[in-house]
Amino acid sequence: LVGGAAIEGFRDRLYAHAVQGSPPKPDFPFPLRYEGVYRERRKVCGVQLYQALGISREDRASAAQQSLENFRFFGAPHVALITTEDELGVYGAVDCGLYVSNFMLAAQNLGVASIAQAALASYPDFIRDHFGLPPNRKFVCGISFGYADPAHPINSYRTARATEGESTTWIE
C-alpha cells in the first residue's frame, strides 16, 4: 500500500514515465483485441465515461489525457500494488483477482471508493525498480482508493452489468 508522501513521488515519476511514451511491457500480456460482447461492453463503457467528462468522440487529445490519469491514480490518496510470485503462474494471478475483489468489497463496506487499474500493469519494471521489488514479483494490477468526490462527473454514471443468464451456466 502506498500513501502519504510516498505516493506523491511515485505518482509524479510514474506519470512522467507514461507521458514520455514508454511502451507498455506488462508481466501478463494485455488482450490484443476485444471481440463480440467484450468489445461492445468496452465501447459502451468508454462512451459513458467520455460523455460524463464532456469529452467528445472527436477530441482524441482529451481522451488521451484522461487515459494518462490512470498513472496519477485518478487523484486517489492511496494505491495498492498487487503482485504475485512468478513461480505461481496464472494461478497466482487468479488468487490476486480474488484478493482484489475482496479488497474492493471491504473498502466499499467502509465507505471508501476504489478502482482496479490494469493500466498500472503497463510498467512493471518501472514499479519494481521504484520500490526495489525482486524480478520474480510479477505485477498484476493496482487498486486506487480513497473517499469519492460525489460532485466529480466521473461518479455520475455506472456501467451496466451482465445478467445472470449472460454470465452463468446452470447445469442440473
Segments (PLM) and residue ranges:
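Acidic, surface-exposed loops and disordered segments
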Residues: L1-E172
